[in-house]
Design a protein with these regions (language model features):
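Assembly/oligomerization scaffold segments
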Residues: 1-112
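Extended boundary segments
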Residues: 1-27, 151-155, 233-261
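An acidic/polar, Gly/Ser/Thr-rich interaction patch typically located in mid-to-C-terminal regions
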Residues: 31-62, 210-338
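Amphipathic, non-transmembrane alpha-helical segments in extracytoplasmic/periplasmic proteins
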Residues: 45-47, 107, 121-146, 161-184, ...
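Conserved "cap/hinge" positions at secondary-structure junctions
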Residues: 71-73, 192, 302
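Short, compositionally biased
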Residues: 81-96, 194-197, 311-322
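Acidic/histidine-rich, surface-exposed loop or edge segments in extracytoplasmic proteins
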Residues: 113-119
């Protein structure tokens, strides 16, 4: 092993037709792993050389194929400094180019043959909690579920799942109460984005860290909303309540009918925070750093008014045989929460 910074990749491809696992390490030309903080499952695209045409004969993809992909980084002393990826994906499509003898495999973190993400359902949930809804839903698919301690777990008197897939319903109800939801390595996790925003920055990013010409920013100068309004009943009395965290301008969002004052405040805060969350966005490319993952925070320095603490929404990890390992970072400046 050379005593220089370098990257090593491992791609273990399990073929459902042959019931065997093959190493594609020596064939890999490019790997792109997309790491999303919330909403979407992680994905991978792997381009492999196929001069011996094994990918279209011996290794020809089957409907239940899986791939485990890992990018390992090593420092000047030859010691491992970090790992990116290291999760299993379900292959859901491939493309082939005969002229260059290349195949690109696309993998997704969400089980592809499951009705979890594909089949709309209608169901009424009563007298339950977010945690129970998530647990029972995931249990139906044999999908491991974990709720982090900081995530809200409200009591829910009644909620309708109306012609929605279980995946979209869980995501929307999690978001309704200010939580984030992520699927990776066949696990579903509900967590508090606010708690992750409070964590210490993993590093400081300056001009010298960023690939020339890759930095861009979009900043909205006016908040979408500065407060909320909701309605609820106490006995025969109908209440309309509102709350602002910035007095001027008064721009409120209507939450509608809620179960209680507590329910209205939880939903109101979550909706205002979500609407204002992406007011200030940056994107840029850096040399790969295993600490820069979705949900991590970093400090931006040397950009004047853009400086501050940022939360990573999305990381596109890219390895090529010619250029090594790079990352495209999409991040939002952390805003004052209601």
């Amino acid at each position: 092993m050379s005593n220089t910074r370098h990257t090593e990749i491992s791609v273990a491809y399990t073929n459902s037709r042959t019931k065997k696992t093959y190493s594609l390490d020596d064939r890999v030309e490019e790997i792109t792993i997309t790491d999303n903080a919330v909403g979407e499952g992680d994905t991978v695209d792997i381009t492999v050389m196929d001069k011996d045409r094994k990918m279209v004969y011996d290794y020809y993809p089957g409907v239940d194929d899986m791939v485990k992909c890992t990018v390992s980084l090593y420092g000047m002393d030859g010691g491992k400094t970090g790992v990116v990826g290291n999760q299993t994906f379900h292959i859901d499509q491939f493309s082939y180019n005969d002229f260059a003898s290349k195949m690109t495999l696309r993998g997704i973190a969400v089980p592809k043959n499951s009705t979890f993400a594909k089949t709309p359902k209608t169901k009424t949930w009563k007298n339950t909690t977010l945690n129970n809804i998530a647990w029972f839903t995931c249990h139906d698919y044999g999908l491991p579920y974990y709720r982090e301690s900081g995530a809200f777990n409200p009591h829910i008197e009644k909620v309708e799942q109306s012609n929605a897939t279980d995946l979209s319903f869980l995501f929307n109800i999690s978001q309704t109460y200010g939580n984030g939801m992520k699927i990776f390595s066949d696990r579903l996790v509900i967590f508090s984005e606010e708690e992750y925003e409070k964590k210490a920055a993993v590093r400081t990013i300056t001009h010298s860290d960023i690939t020339d010409g890759s930095f861009s920013a979009r900043f909205d100068l006016i908040r979408q909303y500065t407060g909320y309004e909701y309605e609820h009943d106490v006995g025969d009395v109908h209440w309309t309540r509102s709350h602002y965290f910035i007095t001027k301008p008064e721009i409120k969002i209507s939450i509608g009918q809620c179960e209680s004052q507590t329910d209205g405040e939880l939903k109101g805060r979550a909706k205002v925070n979500l609407a204002n969350r992406d007011m200030q966005m940056v994107t840029f490319e850096i040399i790969g750093d295993p600490k820069m993952i979705s949900t991590a925070t970093f400090n931006l320095s040397g950009y004047g008014g853009l400086d501050g603490k940022y939360y990573i929404n999305k990381v596109t990890n890219k390895f090529t045989a010619s250029n090594g390992f790079t990352q495209e970072i999409e991040a939002r400046k952390i805003q004052q929460r209601l």
